[in-house]
Amino acid sequence: MSSHHTTFPFDPERRVRSTLKKVFGFDSFKTPLQESATMAVVKGNKDVFVCMPTGAGKSLCYQLPALLAKGITIVVSPLIALIQDQVDHLLTLKVRVSSLNSKLSAQERKELLADLEREKPQTKILYITPEMAASSSFQPTLNSLVSRHLLSYLVVDEAHCVSQWGHDFRPDYLRLGALRSRLGHAPCVALTATATPQVQEDVFAALHLKKPVAIFKTPCFRANLFYDVQFKELISDPYGNLKDFCLKALGQEADKGLSGCGIVYCRTREACEQLAIELSCRGVNAKAYHAGLKASERTLVQNDWMEEKVPVIVATISFGMGVDKANVRFVAHWNIAKSMAGYYQESGRAGRDGKPSWCRLYYSRNDRDQVSFLIRKEVAKLQEKRGNKASDKATIMAFDALVTFCEELGCRHAAIAKYFGDALPACAKGCDHCQNPTAVRRRLEALERSSSWSKTCIGPSQGNGFDPELYEGGRKGYGDFSRYDEGSGGSGDEGRDEAHKREWNLFYQKQMQLRKGKDPKIEEFVPPDENCPLKEASSRRIPRLTVKAREHCLRLLEEALSSNRQSTRTADEADLRAKAVELEHETFRNAKVANLYKASVLKKVADIHRASKDGQPYDMGGSAKSCSAQAEPPEPNEYDIPPASHVYSLKPKRVGAGFPKGSCPFQTATELMETTRIREQAPQPERGGEHEPPSRPCGLLDEDGSEPLPGPRGEVPGGSAHYGGPSPEKKAKSSSGGSSLAKGRASKKQQLLATAAHKDSQSIARFFCRRVESPALLASAPEAEGACPSCEGVQGPPMAPEKYTGEEDGAGGHSPAPPQTEECLRERPSTCPPRDQGTPEVQPTPAKDTWKGKRPRSQQENPESQPQKRPRPSAKPSVVAEVKGSVSASEQGTLNPTAQDPFQLSAPGVSLKEAANVVVKCLTPFYKEGKFASKELFKGFARHLSHLLTQKTSPGRSVKEEAQNLIRHFFHGRARCESEADWHGLCGPQR
């Protein structure tokens, strides 16, 4: 402690007065108590406790000694705003002061810490918050100052925050006791404006102040402050009353003009806004100040008030701490405060210059009940977390003391002094009670009468039995027209209505202004980086889809493809990134909305994971290969996968009737027999080979002619068609084809003719196959190999039907149309292979070579423009209609891979929709009984069974009987369906 004495000369008092005059500009101290406290801190041989009212000069008690000391003084203050006010004030006095808080920039923080590490720091006073004092980042700096003996004082401002019995308890203040113990050689100074005896003892204990403590305490009585209480329930116009109070306190009533300023405290932000509007409308310029405003707006409002551009500021309790404004003429509380100490501290911000000032509290029992409820709720919440404590009652007791201050008769100054343990002061008419006790008593009695909760019954309030609070005075026919007896009878109600209307308009305009400021911000598009792997990364065709989201989806696809390669152990050396980029770009081009884009990416990822789970490599042929294949034909978007309605038309023609552009034309007997011979001699090409035709095959074979390879859910390697789940394009086209098929369903006579055509004796291909050895026919075979061009655009010139020889006419027995029979359809795979069967010998040849030597026949360019015509009443065209129906029914890819018999195509009269409805009704009881392991298996089996029923129907049985028969056969000896493999061996009904 002696080190502090060596700092000062032999006459420290003279040095103190010199600094007071030179730095702070005062000739003398404000009070003798302030001088005594300052000298005690300068001596430094005791810890000091200072309790002075707001504006009494507490800050000078430690600021002046800090300038005289050798080292640095650390000041702990609860609010950054309070710290900033103190720093700004000292900077104007050219004092080296700094603040270490979270709002400093990195450069400012670096410069401050560097100064503190110097041998002789230039900073004399360092302000910090209690959170900063306890932080680990500040400990090295603190230890450095302590080890070099550069810490002169530890000052704790607003020390009442240490006590749990105080009105503003902060848990972080409790950690300052440990900090004080580490700084044993440095004196500690604790300062507060409000301290009851209980709070004072808590401060001594929590901060570990060394006894004996030098206590300097000023009585809380301030003679220049006039306290009064107004009851809102008794005031007809509270806003007008507040306006009159403001003008009177500011001096306008004496025709001196407005002098000074005032503060009005409200409990909520909404009340601040509303009250500021009401005062402004009534002629008192006022602005709101609360935490809901932006920092720049709060600063502007505070500066306007400090410069007295705005005389009245309407604020929450956060305003005023550390504000050095001496000429505050009044402080009004629009709502009751939460404690007596809080009210005293806030009201004490008036009259710091010693001139008469006014403090008014607008009391309402409604406000009292609301605040009491909130306080008790906070206490209950704390008790749930940490249990009951004796200090929990302190908050409620502090609020009850303020309620007693308002509702009981007595001197206001005496009530405040009693609460803080001071001697009763000599008020000398310094409050409303001492000035006019009779008026205060009458107001309290009126408050008791007006309080509705205190009444036990409803009765007339006047002696004549008329109660103005009740309808028509409480009696029928009494006082009905009494209001018209006076000349100004109705003007009061009209005035109140106008005032209410004006208030509502102001409130409405304010709410509209608040909503206008909350318009949604427009999201700015962030351009991609230079190394962005995405295609069309800078495209903004999909709104609200960011480049970051696309890159995330690309990573998902790349990870899924990588896991697929690892699970299948394939030796594919292709770049996974390139594949993922192609998949992502394809999804991006197909989607129009961000949500649909993300859903499509997730679906692709799920498909890849499903393929990995089944042990099969994910094939991108359905997307990437089709794109490369579509680059060659001249019309890539024209019926890539033609539906049945376009492949088979009911338009009657002699030969090849109804084939659309791009489908397989009529084959002559020569071509048919040659292709049959080639099929019998040549080995069957391997399915799923690596080589693939560069273009799609005929629309018929792409839909039905190709035999699906075994695999999960009937997937075809290299293709995009799935068993029971066609692509969306195919679904759309099938639906359009199905509608035209339903309209063109064959009649009963045509169905009988189609049934007769199934007989082997009626098959015209039977006669063609016996003429294989004809050398003339063999010579024309090479030209017939390419007779089936791709459906994607290799079109031959218009052809004319070729005349048959007499032998061919006689074999048929009718006008010939052999290409539409089932045998001819079964011959087509050899001349027009599906896309997954790649053989070099059957590549399509140009149309001019294919049709060499044949007479052209008429064929329309656009099949969609052909009108649907009714078939001729002949046998063969009816067979064509039946073939068309069978292809449409089997369009989902459910043909049996090994079936080559004449019963391959579906029977007439059974649509897929009818079969599906019957199957679902029959299968539902089994699903409810738990016969299926999952709902997906139930749906898959129903789909499979529906296709079986459309393919075959036994004579004499209905679809329902066939479905029930197949279901009984399936569950015979099987308790439950566990996987899709269970129904792979299930065959359709037999004739």
UniProtKB/Swiss-Prot annotation:
Ubiquitous. Residues 859-868, 887-901 have a biased composition (Polar residues). Residues 39-213 form the Helicase ATP-binding domain. The keyword Zinc applies. CDD domains: DEXHc_RecQ5, SF2_C_RecQ. Residues 490-620 are annotated as: Interaction with POLR2A. The modification Phosphoserine is found at residues 488, 491, 727, 815. Pfam families: DEAD (PF00270), Helicase_C (PF00271), RecQ5 (PF06959), RecQ_Zn_bind (PF16124), SRI (PF08236). Residues 734-744 have a biased composition (Low complexity). Binds a Zn(2+) ion per subunit. ATP binds at residues 26, 28, 30, 34, 53, 55-59. Residues 438-609 are annotated as: Plays an important role in affinity and substrate choice in DNA binding. It is an enzyme of class 5 (isomerase). Residues 652-725 are annotated as: Interaction with RAD51. The modification Phosphothreonine is found at residue 839. Changing residue 598 to E: Abolishes interaction with POLR2A. A motif (DEAH box) lies at residues 157-160. The alpha-helix immediately C-terminal to the Zn(2+)-binding site (residues 438-453, characterized in C-terminally truncated contructs) is required for helicase activity, is positively charged, and may play a role in DNA-binding and choice of substrates. DNA helicase that plays an important role in DNA replication, transcription and repair. Probably unwinds DNA in a 3'-5' direction. Binds to the RNA polymerase II subunit POLR2A during transcription elongation and suppresses transcription-associated genomic instability. Also associates with POLR1A and enforces the stability of ribosomal DNA arrays. Plays an important role in mitotic chromosome separation after cross-over events and cell cycle progress. This is ATP-dependent DNA helicase Q5. The lineage of its organism: Eukaryota, Metazoa, Chordata, Craniata, Vertebrata.
